Amino acid sequence: MANPILVTGAAGRVGAVGRTVTELLLKQGKAVRAMVRSEDERSRALRDMGAEVVVGDLLDLDSMHRVIAGCEMMYFGMSVSDTYLAATVNVAAVAKHHGVKAFINMSQMTVSQMSITETTASPQHKLHWLAEQALNWSGLPVVHVRPTVMLESFKEHDQSDLRQSNHSASGG
């Protein structure tokens, strides 16, 4: 695959962002390298869609060199974790080394309201703010996406709740 677009967290469940981005890019005819943490039914589904699936670890430099090599654009997203900042810096360093030309970072809405003198009590929000600062300093061409609400996961969970509610309401 020539110059695939890398999507980290492609099998993730946080708003199904990685999976949705992968699907949309593939529908546009783009070559996609979908990074996952492990092989499972979600990675098989990505492969069935046409993505090049690679197993990687955001905290492992060797792993990230293998995952990022040959990609000029990447969508970076990961689940909430104490290692979020370390993973972001690790990935940014490897992306810079490989000459990534566009780094799209999935951040959080609250980051836009923070500064060096005004932060929040939330450790996750602070990690996202610090990660954005590190990406800005990295020299990479970065775009920060700060969603307010993820409805994709809600839709999946809500549909099963609605089916149960309808079943109960109909006396079934």
Predicted regions, residues:
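Oxidoreductase cofactor-interface core, primarily capturing Rossmann-like NAD(P)-dependent enzymes
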Residues: 1-45, 59-62, 66-71, 80-83, ...
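Extended, polar beta-sheet/loop recognition surfaces of beta-rich domains
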Residues: 90
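Cofactor-binding loops of NAD(P)H-dependent oxidoreductases
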Residues: 56
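Short, conserved active-site loop motifs that form the nucleotide-linked donor/cofactor pocket
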Residues: 50-52, 142
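Hydrophobic acceptor-binding patch used for acceptor engagement in glycosyltransferases
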Residues: 74
